Each structure stands twice: as structure tokens, then as C-alpha cells.
Amino acid sequence: MNKKMFPKIYYYDQDFIDIYNKSLSWIQDKVILQKVADRGKKDKNYYSENCDYIDQMQACMSSFFLVYSNGEYSSTSAIDKFYQLQEESGAIRARYDNNNAIIDLDENEENIGFPIFAWAEYNLYHKTGNKKRISEVLPILDKYYKWIESKFLKENGLYSIDVNKIFYKNSPRVDAYYPIDFNSLQVHNAYCISKLADILNDKNLSLEYKKRFFSLKVKINSLMWSEKDGFYYDLDVNENILEIKTIVGFFPMLSEIPSEDRIERMIFYLKSTNHFGTPNPFPTLSVSEPGFSEDGNGYYGSVYTYMNFFVIKGLEYCGRANIAREFTIRHLYYILDTLMPFNKIKGHIWEAYRPMQEGPAYFDSNKKTYTEKGLICYLALFSISLMIENIIGLTISLPDKTVYWNIPTLEIMGIESLSLKKNQTTIICNKGKRGWEIKMESEKLYYFTINILNKKEKTLPIPSGRCSMLLDKL
């Protein structure tokens, strides 16, 4: 495989470069070509972990790393397949087979998935700058949101859905009637739709979703937050707080729901070894809970990589990039230790891992059954997306023509052949004879903001061609 389809990364730990490169090869096996009617057009490809069906969660999540493939792999084709199957009511189901038939999921009557399409689109816009796409998908997202609203919004202003039957099997959240995760993701859904409407200067739609965003945000903060514990909880059918600390209590960080004071109180739990700060972060259930299992046992303690992605991005969005980086590195090391153990016997990629030591988590400890094996999509969220954005520390906004680089430590790191639409860019930090310097190469002008060790931040226009800057001079 030609790895130049994706950017080349530089990092001082060769193991991280290796897992990045291996992920690129594994992705190739998951990309499916679909023939197009027009012979003059290139065959479109889409990402799918399974050849027999497409999955909404994986379609959306894969867009976060496929967007870095320099256009070789489509980051939108899998998502578009779901849009094409939207029903008149606005419904989009979680899974479809190859004949576009809905796949009925156990006890999921509406076959709903997590409402994350708008989040994927907002991220894609900043990576591709494709404004035309926003105008095409915004009506779809609007109808989808209102379908969810019509089905699951209750009179108290919160959403009710049985997450245990629909999303989480073998979970301690048995009495959750108003789940904090689904409500938080729906807030983020409204937030992203309002932002997309702003891009199109659709003031009416933007205002409509800002109202939805603030209304649900207020409900979550007033009903689902425990001031005593400093944590967000599920509610039971009578709107009573269920004092079971689970990883989804951190999902509100995705959309500016908690205040600064609340964020600090929540981060305490992420750092605490008595709660979620296990050697391999983050378990789905707090260590302090009676049902916590070191073997994982489904959502009683397993470390699910896709759930970690939500938490890491929440920390980043709340301005906690350095903490997000630390946790990303720790989890990625445990993935590496499971994939390449010291006994030299080849390991595997798993859906979930143990919190206290390397190795896959049990889905059911009593039956000794493991979580799903070989899910490359969730690995690539860490080994590609978070590798570029949180470990190396690059945040890209193509519409703004900006690259923000948070350099947390002076080590060799950077990226080569990063595609900013039609602008190939290289940014590498290295130590030369004159000291630490950043070497850059670009085909077009862009604006570069650098944050050095969280002490100094500076924005500079970077012209086309090659240039370098000494960090000491900054």
C-alpha cells in the first residue's frame, strides 16, 4: 500500500509510528468499492467493518480518520448511504444490509443509532472546507433531529430511551430512563446543526437550533448534575438521580454543558485511581462502584476505545488539550501492549480492553466471552485521528486557513504531506545545530498558530514554499 495516501507522521516513539502505519494497511482491507453507473467517474469507495451491512456508528466514526487520506478514500460515502435511505418521517436507521433493507436490532424498536451525523459533518467541514456539502446535508440533519425529537422527547424536556436494550448489553445502568449520554449527544447534535446553519448564513435555522441547544443544556444542568458529587448521572423514571458513576457522565463535555468549575470537578474523577484513572483509562464503570470488574465484564469496567474517543474530544473541546493528550497516550500504549505482547505471540485489536492490565476485556466474565475482535474503525480513531490531533497536537480548520499546533514537549514530531484541500503542507519540529526549530513547506499561504509548552502562543502567516523558525526566537 502507498502510505502517502495518508500523511507521514514524525514522532519520538517508534511504536506509535508503527501502529499508525499498520492502521493504514488494515484500513485498506475495510474499504469497499462500489461501481458507479457513469464510466467516466472513478469508482466510489466506502468504509465498512462488515461486507454484509453498513453500521451508522462506524460510518460516522470512520469519517474522522478517512478525512486524512488525501482524498484517496471517501470520508463521506458511507454516511451518504444512510442519508439516501432517510424515510419521509426523517428516520435513519442504525444498520442496513446490502439490499438497503433495515436490519432489526434486538429490542431496538426504532433501530436508532447515536445522533452523531451532525458532529461528523461539522468535523468534515473544518477538514475539507466543502460548503456545498453543508447545503446538501443540512435539510437531512434537520429532519433527522426532528424525528428523534418526535419519538423520544418527553414533557420534562429530556429524552428517554432504553440505552441498555439499544446500545449497551451487560450494563449496570438498568434503571436509566433519562440517559445522560443520549441527552448529551442530542445537545451536541443541536449545537453542530446550529453551527452548520451559521456557515450557510441561515439565521432562522441557526436560531431554532440554538434554542434547542440551550433548552436541553439547561435541563441537563438542572436535573442530571449532582452538586454533592460533582458528577452527571442518569435519571430514573421519576427523575431521581441514579448514583452510579459511569463513563457516559463525561459526555456533557462535548458541547459546553458544564461550567469551568464543574469541568474541574469532573476531571478529578478521570485522574483518580479510585474512579476512572486506571492504568488503562477509562473504565466504563468507576472503580469505586460495587459492580466494577477488572476483567471488564461488558460495561461493568471494560475500556471501550470508541467511548474513550468521546471523552478525549470532550476534554479537548473544554480546553484541556494536555490532559486529553496524556490519556490518549496511556490508552494507546495498552492497545499496543495487547497487540504486541512481550511474549512475542501476535495479539489482536479488540473492541474493549481491561482497565488494570493489558489484554482484551470480557464481554461476559461468567461465560468467558470476549468483546468483538478486529474492529479497525475504533483503533484508527486513536492511531490516526487522535495521533494527529491530540498526540502530535495539530488542529486544522480549512475554511479559516488555519493550523493550530499545541506542542506539549520538545521532541521530534510533526507531519508530512498533510492535505489542506489542494495545499500539501509539511510541519516538523526537530532539534538542529541552532536549537529546536520548526521546518515548514506549503504550496499556499495559511495561518499558523503555535502554542509552545503552554507558555507562549503566537500566530504567523506562512507563505508558500519552504521556511523555518527557531523556537527560541519565538
From Swiss-Prot:
- Gene Ontology cellular component annotations, sorted alphabetically: membrane
Biological process annotations from GO: trehalose catabolic process
Give an example GO molecular function.
Answer: alpha,alpha-trehalase activity
Membrane topology value:
Single-pass membrane protein
User: Any idea where this protein resides?
Assistant: Membrane
Q: Name one Pfam family in it.
A: MGH1-like_GH
Q: What is this protein called?
A: Uncharacterized protein BB_0381
Q: What is its main location?
A: membrane
Q: Does the keyword Transmembrane apply?
A: yes
Q: Where are the transmembrane segments?
A: 374-398
Q: What are the UniProt keywords, alphabetically?
A: Membrane, Transmembrane, Transmembrane helix
